[in-house]
Amino acid sequence: MERTLAHVPSMELSTEALLVTGGLDNTNKMISSSAVRNDDGTMISQHSDKVSYGTSGAPDGSTPPYPAGGVGEGNGIVGGGGGGGGGGGGGMVGDGTGHSVGSSGSGNDDDKPAKQKRHRTRFTPAQLNELERNFAKTHYPDIFMREEIAMRVGLTESRVQVWFQNRRAKWKKRKKTTNVFRTPGALLPSHGLAQFPSPMNDSFCNFHGQDTRGWPAMSGMTTHMAPHMTTHMPSHQMPLMGGGPGSALALPPSLPRQGLGQSMQQQSVNCSMGQTTGLNTLSMGTNGSMGSMTSMYQPSLGGMTTGSMSSGLSSPSPPNLPVTDSSTDLSCSVSDAGDMWRGTSIASLRRKLEHAASLNGIFR
């Protein structure tokens, strides 16, 4: 071994380098191989470019061999050539110029194809006008129509197809939002408030304050009733028999006992005032007339005497009962739009008013 090292003095440097990087086993193998080459003499140049492999990580040789050093090009010494080679298992191969070429984990990203960048198609006004004109004709053009449009506007068929898809989505979205606010019936009832009559409507009450046709009949009726009422009524309960609208309006509506003439006059005036009072006056009249009218007409007409008549006439009467006469129609008609709370009271009031009309015929 000493003789071999003496013949090859340049191997000392490479041996020291391999002791540091590759390990003792690897160094011994390389030294023996170099000694054989030096004894032969003629094989030095032939075997100078071979790579010696070592098993520095596993002495039993179970792992695959890795290059222990670099390959020196042109000097015949393994690991030489100006800094070629790394340690055992380093995977670096020296090229003799001081540069090492890596062979692991390099250049994988360059193999992937570059992702194609999508660009946005910009339509000219002429192209948009042509596309909109065809969209007005049909929303779903076939392949032949799309190709024809693409030739006219200078686009590809796929671009035309995508434009029609986007345009259909936009049209459906706009249609969905406009259908909600197009008609008020979608949010409000279609009839609105037309079925409820306004308080100032003329059809709400047929008898007006300016119509004085019913006053002569009322005044005549009260004059016939006056003698019967004076015999059995106190002086503080005597009604004012003026027979006009002014006297009827001057009476307080909250007297506990009133005559039939006064109550009828107040009822007719209240009917004429229905334009200003509205639904509240009518509801008060219909609700108050249910219980008070039952005690007024309890006695029968056949056996009615002057005393019973006066007691019946002096009983409390509803303040807002509308009166009907055979000569003048004073009924307050309400539009029958489905108001169930008025239907029952109107039928009962109609029967009571017929009873009042029969009493009017008796006094005449």
UniProtKB/Swiss-Prot annotation:
InterPro entries xref list: HD, Homeobox_CS, Homeodomain-like_sf, HTH_motif, OAR_dom, OTP_Homeobox
Gene: OTP
Keyword Nucleus: yes
Example of a GO biological process term: neuron differentiation
Low complexity composition-biased segments: 303-315
GO cellular component: nucleus
Domain of life: Eukaryota
UniProt-annotated location(s): Nucleus
GO terms, molecular function: DNA binding; DNA-binding transcription factor activity, RNA polymerase II-specific
Name this protein carries in UniProt: Homeobox protein orthopedia
Tissue expression: Expressed at low levels in lantern and tubefeet.
Chief site of localization: nucleus
Protein role: Involved in larval skeletal patterning.
